[in-house]
Amino acid sequence: MAPTIQTQAQREDGHRPNSHRTLPERSGVVCRVKYCNSLPDIPFDPKFITYPFDQNRFVQYKATSLEKQHKHDLLTEPDLGVTIDLINPDTYRIDPNVLLDPADEKLLEEEIQAPTSSKRSQQHAKVVPWMRKTEYISTEFNRYGISNEKPEVKIGVSVKQQFTEEEIYKDRDSQITAIEKTFEDAQKSISQHYSKPRVTPVEVMPVFPDFKMWINPCAQVIFDSDPAPKDTSGAAALEMMSQAMIRGMMDEEGNQFVAYFLPVEETLKKRKRDQEEEMDYAPDDVYDYKIAREYNWNVKNKASKGYEENYFFIFREGDGVYYNELETRVRLSKRRAKAGVQSGTNALLVVKHRDMNEKELEAQEARKAQLENHEPEEEEEEEMETEEKEAGGSDEEQEKGSSSEKEGSEDEHSGSESEREEGDRDEASDKSGSGEDESSEDEARAARDKEEIFGSDADSEDDADSDDEDRGQAQGGSDNDSDSGSNGGGQRSRSHSRSASPFPSGSEHSAQEDGSEAAASDSSEADSDSD
């Protein structure tokens, strides 16, 4: 860059006062102003003032009544663009011999793959596994070989196989034959495993529903880790966990959790004594349990979304195999301890057994009725009605007979009619009861699960009076058998809590059936059979 030279004249011009070289400021007023004083400054800061009027009042458009009432002309063609000839039917007839446009013929041609006979074209699809791939993004050559089969060929193959493998029962006769076939297949002897030909059965036992223990609802309790105490192991730990109990509790902050209780040494001795004496419990004894762990709980039952049915099997020597339903699944995860705060929960659970009340007996009878009662279908009901009508017509014909036969048959007809009325009443009561059970089944099950985990108001009142006890002692193990009979004609049951057994197959609640109720059910069955 060339140097800049400043002359003396330029220096003098630079040191001249500004008043000589500044021009007067132009006024914003067109006319000549007499006084040239400028306006004074604003004495206060600017402020935002709210605009009190609607901003859309000058731009908003509202149609008048004349514009609303005016009917605009709709200018369309008379055929609305659809040319339909109703007189000449040959108008829309397609000529099969018409020549297609060359562009359309090209679209309708089938794709014919030219034979690749040249040696160079055969090497294009060859994949060499030891050679480095030059394409890092494409996933086309990730396999050792390229399938030349078209994907269009395999469309619908899985659906076709599904239809061939599964039998679709479209009518009632095919359903009946399929059901009868299941009974025939059950009579066939099992000679080998269905998928392992070399595996042969050692013993074959029939599988039946557990009518004896079905009245007791069972739950599967799943722990995230082994709940056994650290200081015990082996048979002692299994014995302690088989007598364990879970109970819902609430801390000082109002948070709910599940407490895992283990029996104390004195309780273990009492349970061992009861087992040796072949009795469930001593009526006057009190069993103590101490808290061992705290868990967060997650319950799923039939009312929950995505529930899967679960069953467990009970093997009884010389009797067979029985299955029962696990209608509730409880997942327990360890409760996190607060930072810097040591858990000070030192609870003691006191259990004393009592007889079952009417509400619990009714719940057991309802579960038993779900397993035993059979609701007839519409066709069966119609057949029963026709049979009753025919029986009524035969009664009228018999009444027209001789007086001696009439006198002899009156007692029989009156007895059969009374039995029919009783049977109809029993069926009506069973239907109404089953309908009510189905409608309130979900709500009752959810309430029962909450009551069994966190207790009920009746239990809290009984604990306050120290007269009643907890309802439920769980027995763990899928093959654990609890056969009990009535002692002294009274009913006694274990408590109502869910099982805290570590075995995944579930728990059994032992309960004793009443002989008088069994006799009543047998008499009602006899009445229905007499119909």
Curated annotation (Swiss-Prot):
Q: Where in the cell is it found?
A: Nucleus
Renumbered to this chain, the Acidic residues biased-composition regions fall at 375-398, 458-470
The residue stretches assigned to a coiled coil in this entry are 352-400
Q: Where is this region: Disordered?
A: 1-23, 361-531
Per UniProt, the ranges with Low complexity bias are: 476-485, 498-507
- Keyword field contains Transcription: yes
Where Phosphoserine occurs along the chain?
Answer: 117, 456
InterPro entries for this protein: RNA_pol_II-assoc_Paf1
Mention any Pfam family matching this sequence: Paf1
Q: Which GO terms describe its biological process?
A: cellular response to lipopolysaccharide; endodermal cell fate commitment; mRNA 3'-end processing; negative regulation of myeloid cell differentiation; negative regulation of transcription by RNA polymerase II; positive regulation of cell cycle G1/S phase transition; positive regulation of transcription by RNA polymerase II; protein localization to nucleus
Q: Where is this cross-link: Glycyl lysine isopeptide (Lys-Gly) (interchain with G-Cter in SUMO2)?
A: 133, 154
Could you tell me where the Basic and acidic residues compositional bias lies? 361-374, 399-434, 442-453
Is the Disulfide bond keyword given for this protein?
no
Reading the lineage from the top rank, the first entry is: Eukaryota
Molecular function terms in GO for this entry?
Answer: chromatin binding; RNA polymerase II complex binding
- Interaction with PINT87aa: annotated span: 150-300
Keyword field? Coiled coil, Isopeptide bond, Nucleus, Phosphoprotein, Transcription, Transcription regulation, Tumor suppressor, Ubl conjugation, Wnt signaling pathway
- Return the similarity comment: Belongs to the PAF1 family.
Extract the PANTHER family matched here: RNA POLYMERASE II-ASSOCIATED FACTOR 1 HOMOLOG (PTHR23188:SF12)
Q: Its quaternary structure?
A: Component of the PAF1 complex, which consists of CDC73, PAF1, LEO1, CTR9, RTF1 and SKIC8. The PAF1 complex interacts with PHF5A. Interacts with POLR2A, TCEA1, SKIC3, KMT2A/MLL1, SUPT5H, RNF20 and RNF40. Interacts with UBE2E1. Interacts with PINT87aa which is encoded by the circular form of the long non-coding RNA LINC-PINT; the interaction enhances the binding of the PAF1 complex to target gene promoters and may anchor the complex on target gene promoters, sequentially pausing RNA polymerase II-induced mRNA elongation.
- What functional role does this protein have? Component of the PAF1 complex (PAF1C) which has multiple functions during transcription by RNA polymerase II and is implicated in regulation of development and maintenance of embryonic stem cell pluripotency. PAF1C associates with RNA polymerase II through interaction with POLR2A CTD non-phosphorylated and 'Ser-2'- and 'Ser-5'-phosphorylated forms and is involved in transcriptional elongation, acting both independently and synergistically with TCEA1 and in cooperation with the DSIF complex and HTATSF1. PAF1C is required for transcription of Hox and Wnt target genes.
What protein name applies here? RNA polymerase II-associated factor 1 homolog
